[in-house]
Curated annotation (Swiss-Prot):
The lineage of its organism: Eukaryota, Fungi, Dikarya, Ascomycota, Saccharomycotina. The keyword Magnesium applies. This is DNA topoisomerase 2. It is found in: Nucleus. The keyword Kinase does not apply. Residues 1261-1274 have a biased composition (Polar residues).
């Protein structure tokens, strides 16, 4: 044994040179051969190859240090142009030479040796030790070239400087242990240069020679220098490299990627190459980046100050993270389950950057550790660069990988064929499911639990062996773009997979591996039910390829939409599975029977016995879906893919209204289902969101107006009560809260809302401050019809419309036809499925002018967007684009006043902007000195700025800085046309023309209808006269005679039957039909009036009969006894003459005359509306009573029956037209034809010297919202050329006489001939029950007509007069005004309004 070492022997002190040689891994890395993945340059293919090599990292490092020194010289001397590298493996010799400024050849003042010897032969010497100096070179620690000297057997330095005339050559040997004296010679001519030549000490690296692996890595490093150092020519072994820039360098790698791809795919080298796209960008002088798609994993090639950072670092993370984050934000919009690592793993990035004073993990400098904030520069990836990345196949590769991962995850939840499933308590499993006979079983999927109970009832018929049931909760998930996580968390999808035994993405050719071989869908027969069917089809086609190719796999169970019960002459039930078939039967066959109908909106409407009946007749109720064919897959994708939004828009536009699925088909093609049934779901969403071009309404608005018209809402009604009334009368199915918001929107009158509001905002309906979001709760606010409503929607048109059928009810019309196109006057906005719309509002007077131009076959004038009460400026910047400006002016040296905002820019929005400028934030410095609000009914902000901010604001522009500019576009004007098809309008004139054509057609229809009605009325009166005359003359005996005989005599005498519409029917009818009519009449006689009302109220379905078509003789046989008097006979003759006169007057008018008359009435009403609107908006006290009621009761009590009512506060009655004129109506001046944003705002003192807008800008084609017609409706009062005594006023007086004189229910002994002459009575008080609403009628009526029992029961009509044609046509430019008197009943707040408001009597009385 050797003797133990002493302490002195154990602890040694060695020189730094010895330390480097003994522990080289600290300085140059390992000196042993290692296997590494390295990019090497392959001369044969002229590209970089990712190869596994065996190299000594330390040997490569000493070579790299000399190269980096040469590259660093480019930073010190930008004039450097060339680097020469020579590698001679035979002689183990390497040389690196660079031109440019050389090393100073002088003696160091302190160390007393030459500086070249100090730098290359002495450790810890460098020019990089001054940390206050920011450098972008590779050298940092003072080792560099000295390490190369230490690990070489011979190291020679040569540098020359012609400026000082010297050349310096010095050699070291034996690992820098032997230093030969320098040789300094004269050097007068030639370039400056530095050359280092060395022979590495291969014995220290365990090598005998420079092998191919190390040579390949060294050559690649030379190419690195060529690509990363700009404007330098690099030569290798005397040959110039062809690389000219960093982009050329990157291409060497992409060639390799293409070669690797060919190898992986088994392609030959002759196969055409598809080199990946290079996305190169030089961001700045310090940053160059390039991007390509990687095939395998994340790859990077990066350089910091010419140093190859082979393991990356903070600079690589800095760039990669930006790309990943921005690409992820885009991809997540398409596929939400994308993870950042999935993006990064498909990226190959190249970075060449200059970093100030870089820090690395070690002397080997393979990884940068400098923090981003210390880089000395930024490299922000632009959006354009990201967009270029998105155009590569990066997204495709990411989605493919994500889909593969998702599929693997989804397969974990696959089902299997097993006989029992215990995870789903609601499953009614078939006994044979999961057995060898499972493919014969059918799973019934029902829409909800209620439908499940009905399906279970049906199992009693078909048995439980081969049928099972399971309920769906709500709608299925659209799996086409859903993430794997969403699908895995969707309980319905997972349940179906388990119950059916489905396996994700398995290609099915038959169903023998499933628990159930058939899937049956049992949903409601509505649009939502169709959508559920479509989602299930989409789910199967997306997740289980092949299943839809199997005939009979997918089935649907259909139920009737309407059932007709025939009661006479036979008892029979007819089921209809679509509405067109029902409507056809109703038109062609219904007159033969007495019948009633029942609508089945959902499965819940059917009873258990009916379900049993359905299951007993499966041939009728089961419909198989045809196996996939043709373009079915494309159609499914069209219906459910987010990528097909534009195609889906066109698909919806081409739909022809009335197209339905043929119910007689036994097999339903999926294409037919999508194009004829599923499409209705998307259309229904558009119908709710996009208005009709004819009335400008969406269905909710139309339903509200219909209810108000139907109930004659002339006294205010609480919104909380009106909403349920609308829901009840129109069968609204989307919740009362939605109706509340619709009502509030229709009544809002602040600037930016309706140009004409048809409901009065009696209460807090919202303000301009928040755009109406500050409206009070529905239980505190009231509304009623505005008087202008019936001047826009003329009651004479009501009988002409086609009304919608909902839940056994005839509800609102498909569309109204206003006198003027409200879609232009109030505008419209909405977002539907595939379509959206934005139609700005226009001035009603401009619209009327253009209608009259069309009526006169003249060219239309241009129209510009217009907002009631708005005083800003509207500038036309393009044919279909405008810009709205608020109003701002300078009122002091540094004081500004904002007095108007762009329309529909709410006060709160501007206030937030101003407060941010006043208080500032983390990102915004305060720039407003002070701000005051002085709003009343108008806008007023007072803003004070500093001198500096005032100057800055002038440069930026007042309108821009205060956000007083807002765009408005006419490029997305979409509406349903008169055919019910979606149409995009390119110009407002197109909208007006479409409206004009239909409206004019309907004026002709109105005339035809009124003509026919007058003729029927005249004929009816003639037959009544004839009937009474025959009874008086006793030529016709009606007493003590069988009814059948009497009717036969009336037929022989030529008396027609008259139906409820007033149409006569002459001649005999079938005996069976006559028997039904007679029996129905007998039943009516037996029932008391009270019982009849109760029956009508309680029965869901109305009994219909042939009398609807043929009519009855009630107009004759139902006459009161006193009608047989001589006075009544004479009165009827007079009435007949009046009808004939009215008919003559009507025939003299054309359709255009009728429209012009309505326009005259509209303009008069619009003048009154403007006055009323201004009065309401300027009223200091809003009309609301919710506060009082809230104080009387609890928080939520609207009415306290125990409390004593107090009389409502009254507003002084307005009796004179001058009362409105007391409100100062300032005409709005036309805005100058200049862009206000350019106007230099000066204080008032200099206003006189301020150049005009026109002089300063020279801009024209600016329209003003504030402009008015040359003759305004407020500047003068013009009496009408024709007195209203011949029109409405006279008619109203006569109607009031009749209404007050006759009571339909009065006993005969209380009615005498003297009653025919009565005095005019005043209108009933507000608290009294209003008379029943009556259908439109054209002419003046007499007392006798309303006394008829026939008309009392059947013709609930409001009579509307035909106005005489005016002697000279009124136009929109000439307005008419008439005095306004508001009686007690029309007061803003009535004495008895509390009683009226709390009563629903008017809405429940039918």
């Amino acid at each position: 044994m050797s003797e133990p070492k002493t302490a002195s022997e154990r602890y040694q002190k060695i020189s730094q040179l010895e330390h480097i040689l003994k522990r080289p891994d600290t300085y140059i890395g390992s000196v042993e051969i290692q296997e590494q993945e390295q990019w090497i340059y392959d001369e044969e293919t002229d590209c970089m190859i990712d190869k596994t090599v065996n190299i000594v990292p330390g040997l490569f490092k000493i070579f790299d240090e000399i190269l980096v020194n040469a590259a660093d010289n480019k930073v010190r001397d930008p004039s450097m142009k060339r680097i020469d590298v020579t590698i001679n493996p035979e002689e183990n010799f390497i040389e690196v030479r660079n031109d440019g400024k050389g090393i100073p050849i002088e003696i160091h003042e302190k160390e007393k040796i030459y500086i070249p010897e100090l730098i290359f032969g002495h450790l810890l010497t460098s020019s990089n030790y001054d940390d206050d100096e920011k450098k972008v070179t590779g050298g940092r620690n003072g080792y560099g070239a000295k390490l190369c000297n230490i690990f070489s057997t011979e190291f020679t330095l040569e540098t020359a400087d012609p400026k000082n005339g010297r050349k310096y050559v010095q050699t070291w040997e034996n690992n820098m242990n032997v230093c030969h004296p320098p040789k300094i010679t004269s050097y007068k001519k030639g370039p400056s240069y530095t050359k280092v030549a060395f022979k590495p000490d291969l014995s220290r690296f365990g090598m005998e020679s420079l092998d191919s692996d190390i040579l390949g890595v060294m050559r690649r490093r030379v190419y690195d220098i060529n690509g990363s150092v700009r404007d330098v020519n690099v030569y290798l072994n005397g040959k110039p490299l062809k690389i000219r820039n960093f982009k050329n360098y990157v291409e060497l790698y992409l060639k390799s990627l293409e070669k690797m791809r060919k190898m992986d795919n088994g392609e030959s080298d002759t196969t055409p190459s598809n080199i990946p796209t290079i996305l190169y960008e030089r961001v700045s002088d310090r940053w160059e980046i390039a991007f390509a798609v990687s095939d395998i994993s994340f790859k990077q090639v990066s350089f910091v100050n010419s140093i190859a950072t082979t393991t990356g670092g903070t600079h690589v993370n800095y760039i990669a993270d930006q790309i990943v984050r921005k690409v992820s934000d885009i991809l997540k919009k398409k596929k939400k389950n994308i993870k950042p690592y999935q993006i990064k793993n498909n990226m190959f990035i190249f970075i060449n950057c200059l970093i100030e004073n870089p820090a690395f993990t070690s002397q080997t400098k393979e990884q940068l550790t400098t923090r981003v904030k210390d880089f000395g520069s930024r490299c922000d990836i632009s959006s354009d660069y990201i967009n270029k990345i998105m155009k590569t196949d990066l997204a495709t590769k990411i989605f493919e990988i994500a889909d593969e991962n998702a599929n693997n995850a989804l397969k974990k939840s696959d089902g299997s064929r097993k006989s029992r499933i215990t995870d789903y308590p609601k499953l009614e499993d078939a006994n044979k499911a999961g057995t060898k006979d499972g493919y014969k079983c059918t799973l019934i999927l029902t829409e909800g639990d209620s439908a499940l109970s009905l399906a279970v009832a049906g199992l009693a018929v078909v048995g439980r062996d081969y049928y099972g049931c399971y309920p769906l909760r709500g709608k299925m998930l659209n799996v086409r773009e859903a993430t794997a996580d969403q699908i895995l968390k969707n309980a319905e999808i997972q349940a179906i997979k388990k119950i059916m035994g489905l396996q994700h993405r398995k290609k099915y050719e038959d169903t023998k591996s499933l628990r159930y071989g058939h899937l049956m869908i049992m949903t409601d027969q509505d649009h939502d039910g169709s959508h559920i069917k479509g989602l299930i089809i989409n789910f199967i086609e997306t997740s289980f390829p092949g299943l839809l190719d199997i005939p009979g796999f997918l089935i649907e169970f259909i139920t009737p939409i309407v059932k007709v019960t025939i009661t006479k002459p036979i008892k029979k039930v007819i089921s209809f599975f679509n509405l067109p078939d029902y409507e056809k039967w109703r038109e062609e066959e219904s007159h033969k029977y007495s019948w009633k109908q029942k609508y089945y909106k959902g499965l819940g409407t059917s009873t258990s016995p009916e379900i049993i009946e359905y299951f007993s007749n499966l041939d009728t109720h089961l419909k198989k879906f045809h196996a996939l064919q043709g373009d079915d897959k494309d159609l499914i994708d069209l219906a459910f893919s987010k990528k097909k939004a534009d195609d889906r828009k066109e698909w919806l536009r081409q739909y022809e209204p009335g197209t339905v699925l043929d119910p007689t088909l036994n097999e339903i093609p999926i294409s037919d289902f999508i194009n004829k049934e599923l499409i209705l779901f998307s259309l229904a969403d558009n119908v709710r969101s996009i208005p009709s071009v004819l009335d400008g309404f969406k269905p909710g608005q139309r339903k509200v107006l219909y209810t108000c018209f139907k109930k004659n809402l002339t006294t205010e009604k609480k919104v909380a009560n009106l909403a349920p009334a609308v829901s009840d009368y129109t069968a609204y199915h989307h919740g009362e809260q939605a109706l509340v918001q619709t009502i509030i929107g229709m009544a809002q009158n602040f600037v930016g809302t309706n140009n004409i509001y048809f409901l009065k905002p009696n209460g807090a309906f919202g303000t301009r401050a928040t755009g109406g979001k500050d409206a009070a709760a529905a239980r505190y606010i009231y509304t009623e019809l505005n008087k202008i409503a019936r001047k826009v929607f003329h009651p004479a048109d009501d009988p002409l419309f086609r009304y919608v059928q909902e839940d056994e009810k005839t509800v609102e019309p498909e569309w109204y036809l206003p006198v003027v196109p409200m879609v232009l006057i109030n505008g419209a906005e909405g977002i539907g499925t595939g379509w959206s719309t934005s139609i700005p509002p226009f001035n009603p007077l401009d619209v009327v002018n253009n209608i009259r131009h069309l009526l006169n076959d003249e060219e239309m004038d241009d129209m510009h967007p217009w907002f009631r009460g708005w005083t800003g400026t509207m500038e036309k910047i393009e044919s279909q684009r405008y810009r709205m400006y608020g109003r701002i002016e300078q009122v002091g040296p540094n004081t500004l006043e904002i007095t108007e905002l762009p329309a529909r820019t709410w006060t709160s929005t501007i206030k937030e902007h101003l407060l941010l400028g006043l208080g500032g934030s983390e990102k915004v410095k305060p720039w407003i000195k002070d701000m005051e609000e002085q709003h009343a009914e108008t806008i007023k902000f007072i803003i004070k700025l500093t001198d500096e901010e005032m100057t800055k604001t002038r440069k930026l522009g007042f309108y821009e800085r205060f956000k007083l500019i807002s765009p408005i576009s006419l490029q997305n004007m979409v509406a349903f046309d008169y055919r019910g098809k979606i149409k995009k309008y390119d110009h407002v004139h197109e909208i007006l023309k479409d409206f004009y054509e239909v409206r004019l057609e309907y004026y002709q229809k109105r005339k035809d209808y009124m003509t026919g009605r007058l003729q029927w009325e005249a004929e009816k009166l003639s037959f009544q006269v004839k009937f009474i005359k025959m009874i008086i003359d006793k030529s016709l005996i009606v007493t003590n005679k069988p009814k059948k005989q009497l009717i036969s005599e009336l037929e022989e005498l030529g008396f027609p039957r008259i139906n409820k519409e007033g149409k006569p029917h002459f001649g005999k009818i079938d005996e069976e039909v006559e028997a039904i009519i007679s029996e129905d009449e007998d039943e009516d006689l037996e029932e008391s009036e009270e019982a009849t009302r109760k029956k009508d109220k309680d029965d869901e379905s109305t009994v219909n009969g042939p009398e609807e078509l043929f009519g009855t003789y009630e107009y004759l046989l139902g006459l009161k006894i006193w009608s047989l008097t001589k006075e009544r006979y004479e009165k009827l003759l007079k009435q007949k003459q009046e009808k004939e006169t009215e008919l003559e007057n009507l025939l003299k008018l054309s359709a255009k005359d009728l429209w012009n008359n309505d326009l005259d009435d509209f303009l008069t009403a619009y003048e009154d509306f403007q006055k009323m609107d201004l009065f309401l908006r300027n009223s200091a006290v809003p009309k609301t009573k919710g506060g009082k009621r809230k104080r009387k009761g609890g928080d939520d009590d609207d009415y306290d029956p125990s409390g004593k009512k107090k009389p409502a506060r009254r507003i002084k009655k307005i009796k004179k037209e001058d009362d409105f004129d007391r409100i100062l109506i300032k005409p709005q001046a036309k805005i100058k034809a200049k862009r206000p944003v350019k106007v230099k705002v000066e204080p008032p003192s200099s206003a006189a010297s301020t150049p005009s807008v026109k002089e300063e800008l020279g801009v024209s084609d600016v329209t003003s919202n504030a402009s008015t017609p040359s003759t305004t409706i407020f500047d003068q009062k013009v009496k009408q050329e024709n007195s209203d005594e011949s029109g409405i006023s006279a008619f109203s007086s006569k109607f009031n006489k009749i209404a007050s004189a006759f009571d339909e229910d009065a006993p005969l002994d209380q009615i005498t001939s003297e009653d025919t002459s009565v005095k005019e009575s005043s209108a009933p008080a507000a608290k009294k029950k209003a008379p029943p609403k009556r259908k439109a009628k054209v002419v003046e009526s007499s007392e006798d007509e309303l006394s008829d029992a026939n008309l009392s029961e059947q013709d609930d009509e409001e009579v509307v007069p035909v106005r005489r044609q005016r002697s000279s046509r009124q136009t929109a430019k000439k307005s008419y005004a008439e005095p306004i008197e508001i009686s007690d009943e029309e007061d803003f707040i009535d004495d008895d309004e509390d009683e009226e408001v709390d009563s629903d009597e008017s809405f429940n009385d039918e």
